[in-house]
Amino acid sequence: MGDNYNSESIQILEGLEAIRKRPGMYIGATNARGLHHLVWEIVDNSIDEVLANFANKIKIILNKDESITVIDNGRGIPIEIHPKTKVSTLETVFTILHAGGKFDSNTYKISGGLHGVGASVVNALSKYLKVEVRKNNKKYVMEFHNGGQILTPIKEVGSTSETGTTVTFLPDEKIFKETTIFSFSTIQNRIKQLVFLNKGLEISLVDLREEDEEKTVLYQFNNGIKDYVLELNKTIGTPLNDVFYVEGIEDNIVVEFGLQYNDNYSENIFSFCNNINTHEGGTHEEGARLAIVREINNYFKNQINKNNKGNEDKFTWDDIKEGMTIIISIRHPEPQYEGQTNQKLLNSEVKKIVSNIVGKGLSSYLLENPEDAKKIIEKISLSLKATIVAQRAKEITRRKIVMDSFSLPGKLSDCETKDAKIAELYIVEGDSAGGSAKSGRNRKFQAILPLRGKILNVEKAKQIKIFENNEINSIITALGAGIKDNFNDKKLRYQKVIIMTDADVDGAHIRILLLTFFYRYMKDLIENGNIYIAQPPLYKVENSNQIRYVYSDNELELYKEELLKQNKNYTIQRYKGLGEMNPEQLWETTMDPERRLLLKVSVNNAFEANLICNELMGENVEPRKKFIRENAKYVKNLDV
């Protein structure tokens, strides 16, 4: 540093070096999420071939050496010399940022992904990458290593009657220091969604990493979004109508839409543009809402209430959406998104197009299916009545939220600071543990809210019951930010909301109930990274004058082996509840920011999160049993 600021101080990062220097700019992070982003980039390139109707099969292989292979039966990346770079087009695509067919409207009318950065970014962040191209009855191979350096130039290696591209890459552990291990379930969830969104597409996933068994899944849904709605509704409740499905095209914009009601109380709405999940909605969702409200009210006025005077709409969107499951997917040649994350669609013309296509389809569906229409109107009418009854409870809740700290819940032991950026709220299971937490905390920035027993299961409860529940009201009031559409993170009183429960079955159940509530009513808390799970120790190990707190069975076994080697005697205490620790121990092990372990709660796949919420917390028992059977093997600590 100092005064040596001259021309030599200015770095020019060339080629793929810039990507390796700042990987977060291209894949978000270098954790497990960023690692899997590499897979999505290569898969997205194959999906672009599917969208262009040149491919219908994709195969993903998790190899023994922890590399991954993506195979498609598309046209194959061009191998001719590129007129601008003077090297093969294949080399250009994998070594130059923003090089790709996505920028040429003649090559891809519609595409997803990061618009041409994918292949080069994956290459830059890989220890090794091999690409095989099959086209023109020939097979070509090119290899790279050490972050995109050419290992083997492009060469012809044989003949073939097939077409397509195969990419194998091994992530660089120098970049991905946290992990380079791909998750089978993460990839499985994503490809299942892609198959739903691309009618007729077949994707298989093969795991070769286990010595004794090969794990394989294959997905193909010929009804696309219709199957998607059915899959999602399977675990929620009893369907009230056959799936309403419509597809259409207007001004080169393709619209697919599916809707089904169930007897549950929460809505599930997922929207996509060019296979990208638009979590924050946008103009396609606005168009769908406009059409649904219009056509439901038109049907009610013209078919059910036609003898009564008055032409005003009876139902609002809030009345109509209860118990509704919707999937809307559009394909747009020039999508415009808000920000860099592609989470909200902005194209203004989409609203009218979606409204027209969905509106015409829904109008016909209601007229042609009077029994289904009757059930839908009855469901909406009940929702309207419940809304009126719940309004008073909701207003009480809202009034509580805007009150100052003197009106906060009586059992809340608030912190001294009013600075939300450093304040923490511990939601603690039980009064005894709450007492220890109150005594052991740092009063300056840590608040304690004890819960009496299990909170209400919001997945099954009617809205009126939710707003009347004391425990839920205490949480809403303490946080001060409101719920659902009225949620305002600027009013949030604590930066960290930490769930602290016992390490047993009841504690796990309370955590699930709380997470379900936050996901359904304060989703922004999870999406913004405000929710954490405390990790109290499972064991206290004493030997001589030394005490060590142990947080997992695996850690305990390793420590026991270490003590045995040193010929030391020891005693082990198993903590079954937070109340077994005195305030000093609770602070030292679970609450001290310098020593505690917190798990941040995040949602990578909203569709899968909804399925799990519905399976674990919904009315149907069988899906819950199935989930437990399939996931029991992953449980590390169980106290029954």
UniProtKB/Swiss-Prot annotation:
State the superkingdom.
Answer: Bacteria
EC no. given is 5.6.2.2
Principal EC category: isomerase
- Give the matching PROSITE patterns: TOPOISOMERASE_II (PS00177), TOPRIM (PS50880)
Reaction equations catalysed: ATP-dependent breakage, passage and rejoining of double-stranded DNA
Q: How is the cofactor bound?
A: Binds two Mg(2+) per subunit. The magnesium ions form salt bridges with both the protein and the DNA. Can also accept other divalent metal cations, such as Mn(2+) or Ca(2+).
In which compartments does the protein localize? Cytoplasm
Q: Which positions in this protein are listed as binding Mg(2+) 2?
A: 502, 504
Cited function: A type II topoisomerase that negatively supercoils closed circular double-stranded (ds) DNA in an ATP-dependent manner to modulate DNA topology and maintain chromosomes in an underwound state. Negative supercoiling favors strand separation, and DNA replication, transcription, recombination and repair, all of which involve strand separation. Also able to catalyze the interconversion of other topological isomers of dsDNA rings, including catenanes and knotted rings. Type II topoisomerases break and join 2 DNA strands simultaneously in an ATP-dependent manner.
Name of the protein in its database record: DNA gyrase subunit B
Species assigned in the record? Spiroplasma citri
